[in-house]
Amino acid sequence: MKQKTFLSVGECMAELQARDDGLYRLGFAGDTLNTAWYMRALTRPQDVAVDYVTAVGTDPLSAKMLAFLKANGVGTRFIQEVSDRTVGLYLITLAGAERSFTYWRSSSAARLLAENREVLAASLSHADAIYFSGITLAILSPAHRR
């Protein structure tokens, strides 16, 4: 059987979650990343290539995200790099059992994901299946949502 390619398109964000000792744990998450993560867990690499399509910066946090994806079997070959941007960030705080989220994503490279239509189209042309969410479309400028 020929290997299939599954693409998840969107914004992976850095996540800061408060720990009991007052420090914060750094992780990476987001709806489209979570989908890629579980697709990788549910399929065999020889049967399905799972790749993430996004844009990141060239800063250390973006490099850490790329390393995380690679280490967990999520392909990065379709990830664009934007030199003057970084990745989005959110903070999770707890008030009792209630979680609240604070976002910093205005300088997220993923907002520019569709700026170069040719690069995005070339990435998508490799797919047998593509996943994106409403959030993926919402972070793009109105001109690039089509």
Regions picked out by a protein language model, each given a short descriptive name:
Residues M1-A71, E115:
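Glycine-rich phosphate/adenosyl-contacting loop at the front of the ribokinase-like
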Residues D47-I135, I139:
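Conserved N-terminal subdomain of the carbohydrate kinase-like
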